[in-house]
Swiss-Prot record:
It comes from Phaeodactylum tricornutum (strain CCAP 1055/1). It catalyses: ATP + protein L-histidine = ADP + protein N-phospho-L-histidine. Pfam families: HATPase_c (PF02518). It is found in: Plastid, Chloroplast stroma. Autophosphorylates, possibly on His-292. Its EC number is 2.7.13.3. Probably has a bipartite transit peptide. The signal to cross the ER endomembrane system is probably residues 1-31 while the transit peptide is probably residues 32-50. This is Chloroplast sensor kinase, chloroplastic. GO terms for molecular function: 3 iron, 4 sulfur cluster binding; metal ion binding; protein histidine kinase activity.
Length: 583
């Protein structure tokens, strides 16, 4: 196995297929990270760099593009298999507006503290704003570099070894800082005995040694929001250590303290804005879900009104009673009021869309998964986690089946004995739901998503009767053959009745929507004999005892390339277009 050689400014470079570890260093050579996860600002070391492109969170064997760049502008590109050290926490970055404000403030601070013996030259060499993060391994407070001044270039340092074990290679002796993020005590000498006031403020400006090559102490300023430490500003000098006394004057400390106060206020405001954005997102999701669930019974009401008109007219012709016109008028009023209610709900869609508009962030970290246990957000994250997938929908890591709602460990595989080509199964002790295709199989379930729902012992026939009755009326109006097979003496199950009703409504509604589409390869038009069938089947006894709900239809089924999108939030229109184009 070959290696990668990077020797300062020399022209000796050799690139091969290697297993490497990536290190990020600041402009002074201080160590910042031992992982390739996250999109970090660029850092340079001795004029030699490696630019990593499109890095989000790199796992073992993840392929990415490396560009090695030296001062002579010679470029080499190669696809290599990358193996990083255990994932470090992705930096929680503030908003773009705060970043621009902070850089302007730091530039102003640098220009306001000149060297006494060199007019026009700033006494400040570099500045960095660190954000707090808890170490998931030790539980101790660490600080992650978020904003740097001068604004770093895209240059990076790349150090590689041949070890496949993931053990970090030996660092060059010129590097003075050990791997890892900055521990709290290295930036705050008095930690944990630091405290703020009742509002945004700064702590005592102290000198800390963070670069042995310079010898001069840097200034450390803790930033507070009330009693909580929200960041640390580190200011490094551009001059060497004086023989006597400090490199910083009293005026310098006061100026740094004032800049820190401005950053503390801005950071507190940015944190509050992000928290409000998260609340806004939750409210938008809740409103969108509620609006969707309101439309389903509203549609059933309108269908009942139409059927009522037909029945009244038929009965009126048979009985010749004089009440028929009055009853028809009442049914007509029912339809009119249903239409009015539907019109009143249309502006709510606009409100939901406006609430869903987001302010762009510097970094949008991926949602935490089982393989990213080390990702930890702040108590009030500056960047909210994104998850476009509905909370009740997850994909099984073992079988690839889509699983919703319920937390039982396994799902019993069920075949389709009816006329349907697609089957959706709600299975387990009233607490599993999965989507099956013709090659259905069992898979492990994710952890429980029902922690905040009230579970109770119920009988499915009692819970589902209102739902099935509404769809019987809709099926009659649309010309769909709708049947319900119910096995006698089904056991009681522990469920959240309302949640199960809404889940079943969504699944049956989808079946009604797509059952008329022609089957693949069909030369005919819409499905002439649309059929939807509901079956309740008792599971085998044991740990999986319960009831399985099968929703079957004889429509075209779901194309394989779109099956992993059926529960994605906001994907319904795109999925509908794909289905209709596919057939």
């Amino acid at each position: 196995m070959s290696s990668i050689y990077l020797h300062g400014l020399s022209r000796r470079r050799r690139i091969g297929s290697v297993i490497v570890a990536i290190y990020m260093l600041d402009s002074c050579g201080a160590f910042l990270s031992a992982s390739g996860s996250g999109r970090y600002p660029g850092f340079s070391y001795r004029g030699l760099s490696v630019v990593t492109e499109n890095i989000r969170s790199i796992h073992s064997s993840r392929r990415l593009k490396l560009t090695v760049n030296a001062t002579n502008k010679e470029m080499y590109e190669r696809q290599d298999s990358i193996h990083t050290l255990p994932l470090s926490p992705i930096p929680v970055m503030p908003s773009q507006l705060f970043q621009e404000l902070a850089l302007s403030q730091l530039e102003l601070l640098a220009n306001s503290i000149p060297c006494a013996d060199r007019p026009g030259v700033s006494k400040i060499k570099t500045m960095a704003l660190y954000l707090p993060q808890e170490n998931v391994n030790t539980g101790q407070l660490e600080f992650l570099p978020a904003i740097h001044y001068p604004h770093p270039s895209r240059e990076r340092v790349f150090i590689a070894n041949e070890a496949a074990s993931g053990v970090a290679p030996a660092l060059p002796r010129t590097l003075t800082t050990l791997p890892g993020f900055a521990h709290a005590t290295s930036l705050l000498p008095g930690y944990p005995m630091v405290s703020g006031g009742s509002e945004a403020s700064v702590g005592v400006v102290e000198e800390v040694i963070c670069d042995l090559t310079s010898g001069a102490a840097a200034l450390s300023v803790p930033l507070f929001s009330g009693s909580r430490t929200v960041g640390v500003l580190l200011v490094s000098p551009s001059i060497s250590k004086r023989r006597k006394g400090s490199a910083w004057t009293k005026e310098d400390r006061e100026q740094v303290g004032r800049a820190g106060k401005s950053l503390s206020l801005a950071l507190s405001m940015d944190t509050e804005r992000a928290a409000l954005q998260m609340q806004n997102d939750r409210a938008a999701r809740a409103l969108s879900d509620s609006l969707h669930q309101i439309k389903n019974p509203l549609q059933a009401m309108r269908t009942y009104g139409k059927l009522l008109q037909r029945r009244i007219a038929d009965l009126g012709l048979l009985s010749n009673e004089g009440m028929t016109p009055q009853l028809l008028e009442m049914a007509e009023h029912l339809l009119v009021q249903s239409d009015r209610l539907a019109d009143r709900l249309k502006p709510v869609d606009t409100i939901v869309d406006s609430l869903s508009e987001r302010t762009p962030f510097v970094l949008n970290p991926a949602a935490p998964t089982k393989t990213q246990d080390s990702l930890v957000s702040l108590a009030t994250p500056l960047v909210p986690w994104e998850s476009e997938t509905l909370e009740f929908a997850r994909e099984s890591k073992t079988s690839g089946e889509l699983v919703i709602f319920m937390p039982t460990k396994k799902v019993a595989a069920s075949g389709s004995n009816g006329p349907s080509n697609s089957t959706t199964s709600f299975s387990g002790n009233g607490s599993d739901v999965s989507t099956y295709t013709e090659d259905d199989g069992a898979g492990e379930m994710p952890s429980s998503l029902f922690s905040e729902m009230d579970l109770e012992m119920s009988f499915l026939s009692d819970v589902l009767d209102p739902v099935l009755a509404a769809f019987r009326a809709i099926a009659e109006d649309r010309g769909i053959m709708f049947s319900h097979d119910d096995t006698e003496d089904l056991p009681g199950v522990t469920i959240c009745p309302q949640a199960l009703q809404e889940a079943l409504i969504n699944v049956i509604d989808n079946a009604f929507t797509y059952v008329f589409l022609p089957k693949p390869g069909s030369r005919f038009g819409p499905n002439p004999s649309a059929e939807v069938r509901i079956r309740l089947v008792q599971n085998s006894k044991g740990s999986d005892a319960g009831v399985t709900i099968l929703v079957e239809d004889n429509g075209p089924g779901i194309p394989a390339e779109t099956r992993d999108q059926i529960f994605d939030r906001g994907k319904d229109q795109a999925l509908d277009w794909t289905l209709r184009k596919h057939w």
